[in-house]
C-alpha cells in the first residue's frame, strides 16, 4: 500500500490542521436532478449529488486527474501533465481536501444494482475559517515550479478578498476544482454541483462560499448560479515569482474570485 501511495502522492502536503470538522454521520445526498437532454441511448439521465464516500475517493482523484488537469485553463498552460511530481502534488491536494468530508460527487442514477456507480462530475470542496487562512498556504507546501505557479498565483489573488469584511462571516466554503465528464456536459451537472453548496451551507451553517474560477465557461456557470465577482485580474497581468506572465496564451481574459452568500443570517466575527 505504501509503495502504491508513493507512486501517486507526496508526503509533504497535509491539510489535517484545518480547524473545521464535519459533524459525524452518514454521507448525505443533497440533490437528485434530471438532465437536460437525451443521451444517445434515448433516455434523459438522472444525477445524484452527494458527499463523497470514502470508498470512492481514489476513483474521484483519478477522475480529476483525467478530466480537470487535462482541460483546466492554468494547469494546461503550465503543462502540468508533463511533470510527474507536480501531478503527485495536485493529486495529494485533492486527496487531503477530501478529509474534511464536504466535497461533492455527481453520480448517474442507475436502476441496475449490479452496475458500478458512474462518476459524472466532481467538486473538491473545503471549509476555511478565519484562523485557517494562514494555515492553508503553509499546509499546501508545493515544491515543483509548475504547482508553485498554479497555487501561488491563486493564493495571491484570493488574498485580495477579505471574506470576513466582504460577507461578515467567520468561515466559508472554498474549492480546489470542478470537473464534469465530457459525455455529460450540457446536462446541468456543473449547475447542480454549484447549487448544492447552498444545501451544504444550510446543513452545516457555513454562511458563504468563495472560489477562483479560471475559465470562461465556469465563470458563466457561476454567475448563472448567483456568484458575484469579488476581484478579477487579466491573465496578461498575472505574473509568476520571476515577474513573467504566469499563463501565457490562455484563451480566457480574466481569472476571477467569485463569491456567494449561502445563509441569510451572517455569522458575527
Please tell me what each predicted stretch does.
Residues 203-205, 215-239:
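Conserved active-site alpha-helix within GNAT-family acetyltransferase domains
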Residues 51, 62-80, 131:
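Helix-loop element at the rim of GNAT/NAT acetyltransferase active sites that forms part
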Residues 194, 198, 244-269:
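C-terminal helix/juxtamembrane-tail motif
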Residues 39, 75-78, 90, 95, ...:
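Conserved acyl-donor/pantetheine-binding loop and adjacent beta-alpha core of acyl/acetyltransferases
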Residues 2-58, 66, 267-268:
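Conserved N-terminal entry element of GNAT/NAT acetyltransferase domains
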Residues 161-169, 192-208, 223:
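Conserved acyl-CoA
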Residues 174-201, 224:
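Conserved acetyl-CoA-binding loop-helix of GNAT-fold acetyltransferases
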Amino acid at each position: 500500500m505504501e509503495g502504491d501511495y508513493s507512486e501517486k502522492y507526496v508526503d509533504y502536503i497535509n491539510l489535517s490542521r484545518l480547524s473545521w470538522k464535519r459533524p459525524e454521520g452518514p454521507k448525505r445526498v443533497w440533490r437528485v436532478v434530471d438532465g437536460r437532454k437525451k443521451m444517445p441511448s434515448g433516455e434523459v439521465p438522472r444525477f445524484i449529488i452527494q458527499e463523497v464516500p470514502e470508498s470512492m475517493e481514489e476513483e474521484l482523484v483519478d477522475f480529476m486527474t483525467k478530466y480537470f488537469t487535462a482541460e483546466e485553463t492554468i494547469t494546461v498552460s503550465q503543462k502540468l501533465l508533463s511533470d510527474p511530481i507536480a501531478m503527485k502534488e495536485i493529486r495529494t491536494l485533492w486527496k487531503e481536501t477530501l478529509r474534511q468530508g464536504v466535497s461533492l460527487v455527481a453520480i448517474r442514477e442507475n436502476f441496475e444494482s449490479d452496475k458500478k456507480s458512474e462518476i459524472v462530475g466532481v467538486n473538491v470542496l473545503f471549509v476555511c475559517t478565519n484562523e485557517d487562512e494562514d494555515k492553508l498556504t503553509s499546509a499546501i507546501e508545493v515544491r515543483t515550479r509548475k504547482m508553485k505557479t498554479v497555487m501561488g498565483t491563486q493564493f495571491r489573488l484570493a488574498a485580495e478578498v477579505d471574506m470576513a469584511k466582504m460577507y461578515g462571516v467567520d468561515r466559508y466554503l472554498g474549492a480546489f476544482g470542478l470537473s464534469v465528464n465530457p459525455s455529460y456536459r450540457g446536462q446541468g451537472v456543473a449547475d447542480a454541483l454549484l447549487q448544492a453548496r447552498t444545501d451544504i451551507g444550510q446543513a452545516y451553517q457555513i454562511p458563504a462560499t468563495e472560489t477562483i474560477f479560471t475559465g470562461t465557461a465556469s465563470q458563466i456557470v457561476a454567475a448563472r448560479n448567483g456568484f458575484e465577482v469579488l476581484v478579477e485580474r487579466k491573465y496578461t497581468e498575472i505574473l509568476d515569482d520571476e515577474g513573467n506572465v504566469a499563463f501565457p496564451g490562455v484563451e480566457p481574459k480574466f481569472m476571477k474570485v467569485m463569491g456567494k452568500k449561502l445563509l441569510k443570517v451572517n455569522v458575527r466575527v
